[in-house]
Amino acid sequence: MNQTIAVVFGTFAPMHKGHLDLIERAKLACGQVCVVVSGYDRDRGDRIGLDLTKRFQFAQEQFKEDDLVRVCALDETDLPAYPDGWDLWLERLLDLLNLSEHQVPVFYVSEEEYAQELHIRGYQAHFSPRKFGISATLIREHPQQYQDYIAPAFVDFFAEQE
């Protein structure tokens, strides 16, 4: 019998309450979640001092007490830029997940076009519109205004920037 493993991927620059809500809903639906923190050299997180390594470490800290969540990092530096790299990116992500033949990835996304791209490639993807009216872009641009939305493990990074 197959077991579904939820997959939530993103830049998480920074992780915020909308991401946490999506991860929690994925966990409730599937039981286990793999959170994939992705990025590349000089990406939008890197430009504010929040590179892939830091985001991965903060995400690990966020879920360190949760045995149902596994955090992985996906370095996209050598991949073609979105949207051209979908197939290579997906292949690398699936290799990273290292699922058994009885485990089936089910993607949870907050971008409708991501769900469409995954469906085209034969994967289950649940689109869940953004909640809380927040985005990582808003937080990067106005961290003090949106500090209450930042995931706890990422808060100190922004406090140090003040």
What are these regions (language model features)?
Residues 1-162:
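Nucleotidyltransferase catalytic core that binds NTPs
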